C-alpha cells in the first residue's frame, strides 16, 4: 500500500507566522507558543513559535520550516521575523534572505527575494494584530540561508546572498509535479530576458553532452517536454534547441510529450515502427521489441541502418514538436547516445 505523503509549509507561511507573532507580542504583554494564519487557498493553519526574543521596542520570533515529505533543502531551518515600532508600515529582508540581481523575476532588481504572495500574506496577517493607528517594520531573516541557498536554484536565477521567501498556496505539496513545472517556467522566463533562443535538455546527460550552453541559456526540463515548449511559447522564445538522449527522444518521435515511464513507455514499439520502414527483417524487429534498453537497440541495428535513419528520426522529432506548438516557435533537434555519442541533429554548426 502506497504511503500517503505529508504536506509541509512554505518559507512564506513560516515568515508570515513569525511576523504575526512578533507583532502581536510587540504590542501585548503575552507570550505565544503558536499562532494561526490564513493561507491564500482559504485554509487556516497553526504554526509553533520556536524562538522568542524581546527587547525594548522590538520582538524577534522564529518558526521552524517543516517541508513535510518534500525533499526541500530548507526543511528544518528557522525563519525569523523582527517586528519594530515604526512611523510607517514596512516589510524588508535581512541576513540570509537573497537579493535579486537579474531581471525576469516577479521582483525588482535590488529587492529582497520575498515574493509577492508571501509579502501580501505577511502584510495581511500582521495588520490583523496591529493596533489601530500603529505601524511596524518587519524584517525577515534566516542566518542559515546564505549557506542553504547554494543548494538551491537561487544562484542560477541571480538571487544572491540567501534563500527566497516563496509560496503561492502556503503549503508545500510533497514531490509535486506542479512545483517542478513552476521551476521550469521560471527558468524559461529568466532565460527569455537574456535571449530569444534557449536549449532544452532532459537532465545531466544533456547538460554534459551539449556545447550550446556557451551560446544560449540552458534549461533542464526533466520529462516535461510539452510543458517546456508551451512555456517557451508563453515567454516569446523564438527558437528552441531540444537536445536529448535517444531513450527520451524516441518517445517524442512517437508524439509523447511527457516522457515519464509511468505515463508512457513505448520506446521499443516506436523504434520498431520506424525501423520497419527501413526494411529490417522480422527477426531483428522482434529483438528490438524485446530489448531492455535503447542502447541495446542501437547495438542490434548497428551496421543495418545508415546515418540517414537517425537524421530522418531527428527531422520527425522536429516535425512533432513544431506541430505541438502550432508553429509559435522554431525547433531544432539533436539526438545522442550515452555509448555512441552524437547520432543526428537538424541544424548546421554555428559559425
UniProtKB/Swiss-Prot annotation:
Reactions catalysed, as given in the entry: Co-precorrin-5B + S-adenosyl-L-methionine = Co-precorrin-6A + S-adenosyl-L-homocysteine
UniProt cross-references to InterPro entries, sorted A to Z: CbiD (IPR002748), CbiD_sf (IPR036074)
E.C. code: 2.1.1.195
Pathway listed: Cofactor biosynthesis; adenosylcobalamin biosynthesis; cob(II)yrinate a,c-diamide from sirohydrochlorin (anaerobic route): step 6/10
GO biological process per UniProt: anaerobic cobalamin biosynthetic process; methylation
Gene Ontology MF, one: cobalt-precorrin-5B C1-methyltransferase activity
Keywords of the record: Cobalamin biosynthesis, Methyltransferase, S-adenosyl-L-methionine, Transferase
Superkingdom of source: Bacteria
PANTHER family (alphabetical): COBALT-PRECORRIN-5B C(1)-METHYLTRANSFERASE
Record family assignment: Belongs to the CbiD family.
Protein name: Cobalt-precorrin-5B C(1)-methyltransferase
Organism, as annotated: Thermosipho africanus (strain TCF52B)
Phylogenetic placement of the source organism: Bacteria, Thermotogati, Thermotogota, Thermotogae, Thermotogales
Gene from which this protein is expressed: cbiD
Amino acid at each position: 500500500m502506497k504511503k500517503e505523503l505529508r504536506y509541509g509549509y512554505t518559507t512564506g507561511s513560516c515568515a508570515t507566522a513569525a511576523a504575526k507573532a512578533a507583532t502581536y507580542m510587540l504590542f501585548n504583554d503575552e507570550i505565544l507558543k503558536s499562532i494561526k494564519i490564513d493561507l491564500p487557498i482559504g485554509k487556516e493553519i497553526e504554526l509553533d513559535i520556536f524562538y522568542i526574543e524581546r527587547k525594548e521596542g522590538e520582538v524577534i520570533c522564529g518558526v521552524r520550516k517543516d517541508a513535510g515529505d518534500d525533499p526541500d533543502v530548507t526543511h528544518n531551518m528557522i525563519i525569523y521575523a523582527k517586528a519594530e515600532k515604526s512611523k510607517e508600515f514596512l516589510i524588508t529582508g535581512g541576513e540570509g534572505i537573497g537579493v535579486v540581481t537579474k531581471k525576469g523575476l516577479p521582483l525588482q532588481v535590488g529587492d529582497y527575494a520575498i515574493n509577492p504572495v508571501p509579502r501580501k500574506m505577511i502584510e495581511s496577517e500582521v495588520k490583523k494584530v496591529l493596533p489601530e493607528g500603529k505601524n511596524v517594520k518587519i524584517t525577515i531573516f534566516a542566518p542559515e540561508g546564505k549557506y542553504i541557498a547554494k543548494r538551491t536554484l537561487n544562484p542560477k536565477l541571480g538571487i544572491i546572498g540567501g534563500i527566497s521567501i516563496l509560496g503561492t498556496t502556503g503549503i508545500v505539496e510533497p514531490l509535486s509535479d506542479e512545483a517542478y513545472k513552476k521551476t521550469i517556467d521560471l527558468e524559461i522566463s529568466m532565460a527569455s530576458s537574456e535571449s530569444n533562443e534557449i536549449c532544452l535538455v532532459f537532465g545531466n546527460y544533456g547538460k554534459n553532452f551539449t556545447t550550446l550552453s556557451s551560446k544560449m541559456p540552458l534549461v533542464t526540463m526533466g520529462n516535461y517536454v510539452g510543458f517546456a515548449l508551451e512555456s517557451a511559447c508563453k515567454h516569446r522564445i523564438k527558437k528552441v534547441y531540444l537536445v536529448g538522449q535517444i531513450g527520451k527522444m524516441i518517445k517524442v518521435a512517437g508524439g509523447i510529450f511527457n516522457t515519464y515511464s509511468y505515463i508512457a513507455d513505448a520506446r521499443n514499439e516506436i523504434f520498431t515502427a520506424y525501423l520497419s520502414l527501413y526494411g529490417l527483417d522480422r527477426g531483428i524487429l522482434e529483438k528490438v521489441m524485446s530489448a531492455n534498453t535503447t542502447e541495446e537497440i542501437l547495438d542490434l541495428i548497428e551496421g543495418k541502418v545508415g546515418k540517414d535513419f537517425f537524421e530522418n528520426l531527428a527531422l520527425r522529432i522536429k516535425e512533432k514538436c513544431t506541430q505541438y506548438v502550432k508553429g509559435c516557435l522554431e525547433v531544432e533537434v539533436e539526438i545522442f547516445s550515452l555509448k555512441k555519442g552524437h547520432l543526428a541533429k537538424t541544424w548546421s554548426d554555428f559559425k
